[in-house]
Amino acid sequence: MSIVAFCSAKGAPGVTTLSCLVGAAWPDGRRVLVAECDPSGGDLAARFSLGARPGMTSLALALRRAGGAAGLVDRHVQRLPGGLEVLVGPPGAEAAATIDSELGQVAATLADHEADFVVDCGRLVPSATGQSELLRQARIVVLVLRPDVAAAAHGRAASARLLGSGADAQIPGAHVASAGVGAHLVVSGSGKADAREMASVIGLPLLACVPADPAAAAVACGEPGSARRFERSALVSAARDLAARIAAELSSARASIQAGSRSLGEGGTGTGSGTGTGTGTGSGTGTGTGSGSGTGAVRSVREQVIA
């Protein structure tokens, strides 16, 4: 299905936590897995007392031996206490570096799988070639930044890399454009910078603002807390809205691609292409509305993450 990659440009704006919350809030009827592919190493195994294997390391080794096969993925999945399916990353940068060369094959395998994948790519690292390949394979890339001037400066450089411009660009702009949706900005936490101004400076459309909510974030990381307060928290509400928006954009992009394929198969010309675009827009609007109105029925985020 589709890969949605979350990444950051500086610091720790909560990419792992947000990835898990978005995965837990994914619209009903669509299977989703969260995959940790942070070059600095994974956190989920330590947070939830899981083993490092099965996970990304064992999947990478299996693909190295057997080649790409989407059916291999499910053998390396673990579940958080509440049931959210995850591919845990290896602990630490040194361990993560040992599978970096396999991440391109991992990305292709995830893209062929029947589920959607929310991938925690961590902080952007130019030397991490596997991370770059994952971002190339993603249909949506979400850059998560805190609202401050320093983050905006780093975000501008990251945007140039994501869009394939600038001296250090490693992700071709042609890929981002052909992905159907592209790159977006999410501003997370509290700070002095205005989110819309940051988006303008960075050059990415603002997808969402996620409020600072340390208490809810702690619960999402496995610490004890009130289930009722967590479910009603601003952080969970923002994650649900973000999941619905992303899912709607994916549905719209898929509809456009399918309509375009039908037009080409029927020998359609410019008119056929126009019909395809119309179908994509209609589907996107309908799906977005449906997802938004149905978020109340989404299984408890806390239930999926921490039981």
Where do the protein language model's features map onto the residues?
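Walker A/P-loop phosphate-binding motif and the immediately C-terminal alpha-helix
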Residues: S2-S40, L44-R47, L110
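Short, hinge-like loop/turn segments at secondary-structure boundaries
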Residues: L50-P54, R161-L162, V201, P224-R228
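Conserved catalytic-core segment of NTP-binding enzymes
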Residues: Q105, D112-A212, A218
